[in-house]
Amino acid sequence: MSNITDPQMWDYDGDPNFTGMPPIDEDYRPCRLETETLNKYVVIVTYALVFLLSLLGNSLVMLVILYSRVGRSVTDVYLLNLALADLLFALTLPIWAVSKVNGWIFGTLLCKVVSLLKEVNFYSGILLLACISVDRYLAIVHATRTLTQKRHLVKFVCLSCWGLSMILSLPFFLFRQAYHPKNSSPVCYEVLGNDTAKWRMVLRILPHTFGFIVPLFVMLFCYGFALCTLFKAHMGQKHRAMRVIFAVVLIFLLCWLPYNLVLLADTLMRTQLIKESCERRNDIGWALDATEILGFLHSCLNPIIYAFIGQNFRHGFLKILAMHGLVSKEFLARHHVTSYTSSSVNVSSNL
């Protein structure tokens, strides 16, 4: 998942064609973008698709993992929390979609709550991805199961991820409010008095650092050493794990690297390290909208990366269907699925 900022941060709707961060000065005149309305509705459709796909995919992941109480692995616990984070994030998308059209019409309380929920689940998702990479590193490079299989330790790590996510998200809860500038649509964003612009840069750099750069280096380090170990092993089953690891890193980079590069350029422009112009502002605004879509898409792809790509997940899902009489034992036999009463589901064995 990246940093994911609320849609109103990038598109200021005093007029449907105005773009830019919501100004503190009510006499501010932002740049115009003639095709902003079209872009707005493209984003709305994307929010809807991501919401539906994430709701379905992550719900299925949680269902399969929760059914595997006996054989649940450490990675399964991480995946369960990751699916929950993605699911909770997806639940906020309809509200942001409505705000794209009508501005923020939900008041300050919901502005704070929804912003907190979105940021918490963004941070927790990224931190859990990093934890999964550390777990794979220990299991593959050091063949360490004593540490990673301690359930109470894993639960503590997951709780720590949620707790740290809450701490990192507190500024959004404390300072965000519904704000209605003169002659403009209402917005949900941070209001910090005369220092709002400066603190908004801090709140942008914070998630850029903790939400992408740090987890990325952790993942690259852990998966890099894991891949080296697997290449030396020359084992067929481990080559399958290599493909999954490649998919994890590749999809993460494809989803979040473009957005964070554009976000970095936008931050440099707004801190006057690179020259700001209406043309550049509009280009960056378009790029942020486009690359943000990739970031949102990551919450839909997580079930594919960590679950659907694994044969055991498909078998586990079929076992659940068989337990409820939706498929026959003959169907399971044709698909080489062991009896659903003889073994439990393990989602992550192919990771």
Curated annotation (Swiss-Prot):
Disulfide bonds, paired cysteine numbers: C111-C188
Pfam families, sorted: 7tm_1
Cytoplasmic compartment residues: 68-76, 134-154, 231-243, 311-351
Regions that span the bilayer: 47-67, 77-97, 113-133, 155-175, 210-230, 244-264, 290-310
Keyword annotations of the record: Cell membrane, Chemotaxis, Disulfide bond, G-protein coupled receptor, Glycoprotein, Membrane, Receptor, Transducer, Transmembrane, Transmembrane helix
Annotated PANTHER family: C-X-C CHEMOKINE RECEPTOR TYPE 1 (PTHR10489:SF916), CELL ADHESION MOLECULE (PTHR10489)
Name of this chain's protein: C-X-C chemokine receptor type 1
Organism in which the protein naturally occurs: Pongo pygmaeus
Gene that this polypeptide is encoded by: CXCR1
